[in-house]
Amino acid sequence: MNCLKQLIEIKKSSLVILNDNNYVISHMKPTNVKVLQVWHACGAVKKFGNQIKRQYPVRNYDYVLCNAEYWKEPYSQAFGVNTNQVLVTGMPRIDTLLNRNERDEFFLKYPELKDKKLCLYAPTFRGNIIDGFKIQSFDFTKVKDYVVLYKFHPLLGDIQCNGGVNMNKEDLYTLMQVSDCLISDYSSVIFDYSLLNKPMISYIPDVKEYKHNIGLNIDFDDFPGPVCTDEDQLVKALEFKDYDYDKLSYFQIKYMVYTDGKNTSRVIDTINQIMEEV
């Protein structure tokens, strides 16, 4: 019934804007309707969409937005489009990240965290709806110099972990702003966080298995921070000795071109151009 309702609304439209894949669009899109995929992430560390085995092929998109030229090829594969249909506009959400500041509000809510060194742990989810979701965690009590704030993917639910502070109900961008560093893995949050010019660590103990089973769209040699495969490496890496900010700048330029606060304007201009064509 939900598919039928969607189809009725789609048929009434000239343009459909998506931020996730859509079964109805991939199977029943009317020929006179244009589809713009803005996606819900700023990039894709792991392969996704048509790059991996899935229940149905992603198709019928007319345009896809991305953050840099680098993403044209992986996005064309994932969304079943030609590279010339992938448009480099930047994501509106980046304007939000760079232009707002909610530190004061956060520390009013959590006064016990003020003046503490805060490390945000924000991993991706593993698994799927059929087989169940999993999480790659570590012993937060081993981290001595930071308070670990953890926020997991919404699909994982409100999981509790000992030794850290549960931030699953807080806004991710607020947590990025208040934290001093990030630990993540195959999550696209590394692209957003890189623009804040703060240190990052990649904790990927299962990288060989992950490359084999899922596949990656980026080379972790590009990652600007320590890449750790066990907990001891991770704890040591949190000392952040000689962090390579030049490499961080290269990472930003390669994967996240626009930081001028005008991504939203470019996306609106793109939508207006599409509407003139329909």
Tell me the role of every PLM-derived stretch.
Residues 20-21, 67-70, 154, 186, ...:
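Helix N-cap/beta->alpha junction signal
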